[in-house]
Amino acid sequence: MLPVVALVGRPNVGKSTLFNRLTRTRDALVADFPGLTRDRKYGQANYEGLQFIVVDTGGISGDEQGIDMAMANQSLMAIDEADVVLFLVDARAGLTAADQGIAEHLRKQNKSVYVVANKVDGIDGDSESADFFALGLGDVNQIAAAHGRGVTQLLTHTLMPLSEQFPDMQVPEDEEADEEIDAEKQLEKLLASPIKLAIVGKPNVGKSTLTNRILGEERVVVYDQPGTTRDSIFIPMERDDREYVLIDTAGVRRRRSISEAVEKFSIVKTLQAIEEANVVLLVIDAQEGVTDQDLSLLGFVLNSGRSLVVAVNKWDGLAKDVKDEIKRELDRRLGFIDFARLHYISALHGTNVGHLFESVQEAYNSATKRINTSMLTRIMDMAQADHQPPVVRGRRVKMKYAHAGGYNPPIIVIHGNQVKDLPDSYKRYMMNYFRKSLKVMGTPIKVEFREGANPFESNTNTMTDSQRRKRKMLMRMHKNNK
């Protein structure tokens, strides 16, 4: 599970600038699909070896009377569910009544709140930030979000205390010698655990109905088992002699009250469920078609590398010409996830619901399919023979060998000379070649390219990202103790 960082502050203090810097395009090929709409307020950040969910609470505003209680419900919910709140203020504008109003609201939330003075570039940050100590929220962290100044130190200072609570927050180091062994251990752990299935979708697409239909078909005794993912409920179940854990984000709490259950939608809770799941079942409303919110959720699923099954709900009762038009639109807008199975269902009447688990099982099997080094290297050689890599700086790129780097999603690591200079088009070609050769269905594939270091280039030892972060923390602590 990843921690949630909420960016709070009045308008024009730099929340969006910091958000954009933290959620810059990631290197993972699974996110490199045309036609993908990315949400502007919720994102997955991978910054300087730290990964987390970041929320831009744009609905927060303040005035002389204090906090505006009519602020957006999603913004309030995001603050309530956040692990860290970064309260941004404008160092150039100084302390305002709106800042004081927001601070008064945040003090009541019992959250880890850090004051962040933005726009300190070109001014005396210490003197211009002094007034913000009056907010009564502790030290003032100085940054220039537009240029990235102080951002790494800020994240290290605010997120490192959570490292034990969120072990997945730190991106693993590239220890290539043990990578294959670690991948094998990860696979063994996955295969020994139940399949975690998250049913996600925007409000009122039928997630609650589908959850209840699935549980009703299984005829099992269902009880509330609180999970670790905020308010999501983890429901154990069995199907076809296979254990599952259904991650319920729809707000359903007890079987006896499902008829009057009101669906509660939380974007943060949905993102946490996606991170926790092995397979994500995305529910789309057939009558509304594919919306930008659906595409945003798809973006989070792809960035997380989770297996994917798409269910188009409310299919019963539609005329044939309407169904044909919907299918054409789905083909056009969802062409970038051609690896995912698409099902047309009616959660209310149970039509085709039973077939969903065939695709869930197929997707999970693809995501956890054991792949050895010799097979991957052979496929890599075949791909090179069919379509040679390009010439870079007068030398043809040479891929030497490939091995497994992880599962769920399958990660394939290719080693060679100048492989990092390969154009994106060739990287996509390699990804698609591996997908077809391995007959992978229902899961994205991530391909990483590594270059061997020249042992004669330098005699100095290079620090890892983890060592650099620890060094910065020690230097900061030493500076504060002076």
Curated annotation (Swiss-Prot):
InterPro entries: AAA+_ATPase, G_ENGA, GTP-bd, GTPase_Der, KH_dom-like, KH_dom-like_a/b, P-loop_NTPase, Small_GTP-bd
Annotated GO biological process: ribosome biogenesis
Pfam families per the UniProt record, alphabetical: KH_dom-like, MMR_HSR1
Entry's Gene Ontology molecular function annotations: ATP hydrolysis activity; GTP binding; ribosome binding
Binding-site residues, GTP 1: 9-16, 56-60, 118-121
Residue numbers binding GTP 2: 201-208, 248-252, 313-316
EngA-type G domain residues: 3-166, 195-368
Protein keywords: GTP-binding, Nucleotide-binding, Repeat, Ribosome biogenesis
Domain KH-like: residue ranges: 369-453
Similarity remark: Belongs to the TRAFAC class TrmE-Era-EngA-EngB-Septin-like GTPase superfamily. EngA (Der) GTPase family.
PANTHER family to which the protein is assigned, alphabetical: GTPASE DER
Subunit structure and binding partners: Associates with the 50S ribosomal subunit.
Record-given protein name: GTPase Der
Species per Swiss-Prot/TrEMBL record: Pseudoalteromonas atlantica (strain T6c / ATCC BAA-1087)
